[in-house]
Amino acid sequence: MALSMPLNGLKEEDKEPLIELFVKAGSDGESIGNCPFSQRLFMILWLKGVVFSVTTVDLKRKPAHLQNLAPGTHPPFITFNSEVKTDVNKIEEFLEEVLCPPKYLKLSPKHPESNTAGMDIFAKFSAYIKNSRPEANEALERGLLKTLQKLDEYLNSPLPGEIDENSMEDIKSSTRRFLDGDEMTLADCNLLPKLHIVKVVAKKYRNFDIPKGMTGIWRYLTNAYSRDEFTNTCPSDKEVEIAYSDVAKRLTK
């Protein structure tokens, strides 16, 4: 994908930075692979509205020039005006700092609680899916459900901005589209890729569905699936299943 070069004579701050994102490739070596960290950065750059290019990296056949660019580093990583950056959390902080208003959107959540909502889900899911002992399955599933319930409660609890102090009407349930409001933030870029993996993998290898009664989570996922920033940066369900084919353990007596 070609980058749009800035025109000569523009002020330095008006020039588009040269950004290339390197993400994990799928099983075919070309499509987007299963990597929530790759998707996290992909979503951030897309939401920022900045011009950037994306290169999928086949870990089985990593090209020599990429090994020289970031020796010993697996995707995701970025080059920003030819400077290599490899730490995902630091990349997120850097992009939020340099790609700032008024030219680019601010993506930090307004409510600190949005940053930690759902943070325990992936660890509980990993323990659940890697377990091979039938006698431990029920307790591990309960642990996963408990963390999902906590997220569901957060998504259904009105944020301060949804409550009108002058209104006589008591808002009992939130209708917001995402974690921090009606627009995606950095918190969504972190959680949504992981939540999607949980949904796909738990169904495939444990026949587990996120309960339909968790209306906050299902509203959240439905809204995410309606956004290009999520669906176009997301690996296919098949890629996610392939990635977990050796990780997900069969329950054996």
Curated annotation (Swiss-Prot):
One of its GO terms (biological process) is multicellular organism growth. Residues 81-244 form the GST C-terminal domain. Channel activity is redox- and pH-regulated. Anion vs cation selectivity is enhanced when fully oxidized. Detected in brain, in cell bodies and dendrites of Purkinje cells in cerebellar neurons (at protein level). Expressed neonatal and adult cardiomyocytes (at protein level). Marked expression was found in hippocampus and cerebellum, and in many other tissues. It is an enzyme of class 1 (oxidoreductase). The keyword Metal-binding does not apply. Residues 2-101 are annotated as: Required for insertion into the membrane. Its EC number is 1.8.-.-. The modification N-acetylalanine is found at A2. One of its GO terms (molecular function) is oxidoreductase activity. It catalyses: chloride(in) = chloride(out); thiocyanate(in) = thiocyanate(out); nitrate(in) = nitrate(out); iodide(out) = iodide(in). It is found in: Cytoplasm, Cytoskeleton, Microtubule organizing center, Centrosome; Cytoplasmic vesicle membrane; Nucleus; Cell membrane. A motif (G-site) lies at residues 35-38. Coiled coil: none annotated. The chain crosses the membrane at residues 37-57. The modification N6-acetyllysine is found at K24, K130. The modification Phosphotyrosine is found at Y244. The modification Phosphoserine is found at S4, S132, S167, S236. It holds the Pfam family GST_C_2. It is a single-pass membrane protein. GO terms for cellular component: apical part of cell; cell surface; cell-cell junction; centrosome; chloride channel complex; cytoplasm; cytoplasmic vesicle membrane; cytosol. The active G-site contains a monothiol Cys-X-X-Ser motif which mediates glutathione-dependent redox catalysis. Members of this family may change from a globular, soluble state to a state where the N-terminal domain is inserted into the membrane and functions as a chloride channel. The redox status of the active cysteine in Cys-X-X-Cys/Ser motif likely determines the capacity to adopt a soluble or membrane-inserted state. A conformation change of the N-terminal domain is thought to expose hydrophobic surfaces that trigger membrane insertion. Belongs to the chloride channel CLIC family. In the soluble state, catalyzes glutaredoxin-like thiol disulfide exchange reactions with reduced glutathione as electron donor. Can insert into membranes and form voltage-dependent multi-ion conductive channels. Membrane insertion seems to be redox-regulated and may occur only under oxidizing conditions. Has alternate cellular functions like a potential role in angiogenesis or in maintaining apical-basolateral membrane polarity during mitosis and cytokinesis. Could also promote endothelial cell proliferation and regulate endothelial morphogenesis (tubulogenesis). Monomer. Interacts with HRH3. This is Chloride intracellular channel protein 4. It comes from Rattus norvegicus. The lineage of its organism: Eukaryota, Metazoa, Chordata, Craniata, Vertebrata.
